Structures are given as C-alpha cells and as structure tokens.
Design a protein with these regions (language model features):
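Loop/turn elements at helix/coil->beta-strand transitions in domains of secreted/extracellular proteins
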Residues: 103-106, 142-148, 191-194, 220-224
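Solvent-exposed loop/turn segments at secondary-structure junctions
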Residues: 80, 112-117, 153-157, 201-203, ...
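Accessory cap/linker subdomain of secreted extracellular hydrolases
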Residues: 45, 228-307
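Alpha/beta-hydrolase active-site loop
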Residues: 163-185
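Catalytic-loop region of hydrolases
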Residues: 27-102
C-alpha cells in the first residue's frame, strides 16, 4: 500500500509533467522571489460583503501581441471550505466581430501549472508575453471567442495557492464566469454563453467547473467544457518519475494541500526531514519554468522521514 509520501509524490509528477510536455513557451519567465504583490492584487481588508462572482475591481491592461481589449479583474470567490476570498484574472475580448449565431460566447480558461510564487500569476506573465497559455488564447480569440483566464486562488493575491484542489479551482472558474457577465462595458456580450477550457491543472479546473456548475452556479449558461489531460491516473507517473528531473515539484502539491486545509499543515510537514522542509519553503517561490532546478533527480527517500 502506498505511503502518504508516495501518494503526494504521485500527484506532484502529474502536475509537473503535463505543462512541459504540452509544449510550454519558456520565454524568460521570472523566478525567485514570491513577493509579487502590487496594489491591484491586494484585496480590500476586510473583504466587502456580497455574492460570489462580484467584481471587486477592474482595470484595462495591455495585451501584448493580441488584437483584443484586455481587462484585469479581481472578483469574489470561495475557497475549498467555503470561505470568502478574492481571486484575480484577465478577460480578453477580440477586436474582430463574432460571426456565429447569437451573442459572442465566452471561454473561461483554466491555466495549466504555473507554480506557487505570486510572480507566477497568469495575469502577470501574460502582460510580458511569458504566459504559455497564449498558445490557447490566440486561436480562441482568432475564432471570435472572448476568453477569461483565472489566476486561481493564491496566485498574485495573498495566501497560499491550493494547487490541484478541484473545489477551489472550480469555484475560481465559475466565479470568473459570473464576473465576466458583469463586464458588458468592456466588450462582453449580454446573453453570452459560457464554455470551460483547460489542460493539465487547467483540465482539472475545467472538469471541476462543469461538475460543480449545477449546484454552485446553476444560473450560468454553461454549454460546453473541454478538459485536456486532467490529473487522474497517477501510479505509472510515480514509478517512472521518482528521482526524475522534475521530482522537486512535490513541494507544490504538499504546500497546496496545506494551503487548502491549514489544519493538517503540521502533520504534512512532519513527514519531511530538514532538507525536505527546505524544499517546501523554496517551492513556494518558484514558477513552473523553475521546475528543472527544483532539486532535480532527488528521490523522495532523500527528503522524507519514512523514505
């Protein structure tokens, strides 16, 4: 029977391999410091009352290389345990008119693995042409779809990123759809239909949004969901990847679980020896492009208590 450490490592391999195998554009992404807050990403304290999906603030931003109107948005959402949080994202509306039937549809895009540092937030990377999800955004805009890309909980905004938590990610997707419906002054068509899209971590997010929509956001006009390679069958990856180039990414999974459920943080971290706890601390500062230098080729036996 797999140990808790082995199960955590299994999850880590899935989230690490998918975006890199998918052909990510590693264009000089920022690394290191996780102190990537600026004024936009600091939510009101206390968070004002309201409903999930309410827009807390929005501002126009530059969309490099895109023929689109871009709006950065902060919106209200819920974490894995139902607590109110603020999440950020970006909404893109193409300049070209919609040639299909009815109002222009909106695709809510769940990004693949980004990392854990606040500087890894997709809305920050997209501003500098360092976001590999442009590989999906560009063709969607070319077809006339509006695209809304979430940063997820804890990327850019204060607090940890609950990596691979389907509830948090599903809520972030659904609440961005709600927020987008309020941006008719920024090009979103009234009566827009909603679709979900994502690969890897984003595939999990797209599937989670589709699964949760009926109970969490039944009012949304959801018509489709595309979920590519969501983390699912993990055993083979665990066997093949223990001690691989990307093995240090287990820190993202452990830190993500602790961010979603802080009451188990001490127990989780107790499974790691001092070297392992150092890996966890540094993992909170890394983006996905840093993965090859996150203790590559370290077998889990080197940094866990039980091996």
């Amino acid at each position: 029977m797999p140990t808790p450490t082995a199960r955590l490592f299994t999850a880590a391999l899935t989230m690490l391999l998918a975006p890199l195998v998918a052909g990510s554009v590693a264009a000089a992404a920022p690394t290191g410091s996780a102190s990537g807050h600026d004024a936009f990403y600091l939510p009101p304290d206390p968070l004002p009352g309201g409903a999930s999906g309410d827009v807390l603030r929005a501002e126009p931003v530059v969309a490099p290389a895109l023929d689109a109107l871009a709006t950065r948005v902060m919106y209200r959402s819920e974490n894995a345990t139902g607590g109110p949080i603020a999440v950020t994202g970006t909404v893109f509306v193409p300049s070209r008119p919609w040639a299909g039937d009815g109002p222009r549809p909106t695709v809510v895009l769940g990004p693949g693995t980004q990392g854990m540092g606040d500087q890894c937030a997709p809305s920050k990377l997209a501003n500098h042409l360092q976001e590999y999800e442009y590989l999906h955004i560009v063709p969607l805009l070319a077809r006339g779809y509006a695209v809304a890309m979430t940063d997820y909980e804890g990327l850019g905004t204060p607090g940890g990123h609950p990596y691979l938590n389907r509830v948090s990610q599903g809520h972030a997707m659904l609440d961005l759809a709600r927020a987008a419906l309020q941006l008719t002054d920024r090009g979103i068509d009234e009566g827009t239909r909603i679709g979900f899209w994502g690969y890897s971590q984003g595939g999990m997010s797209s599937a989670a949004a589709a699964e949760l929509a009926g109970t969490y956001a039944p009012e949304l006009p959801v018509v489709a969901a595309v979920a590519g390679s969501p983390p699912a069958s993990l055993a083979d990856l665990a066997v093949a990847g223990d001690g691989s180039l990307l093995s240090g990414g287990i820190g993202w999974v452990v830190n993500g679980f602790a961010a979603a459920y802080p009451q188990v943080r001490e127990e989780l971290f107790g499974a790691f020896n001092p070297a392992g706890r150092d890996i966890l601390a540094r993992a909170e500062t890394f983006c996905v492009y840093d993965a090859p230098r996150m203790n590559p080729f370290f077998p889990t036996a080197w940094y866990t208590v039980d091996g």
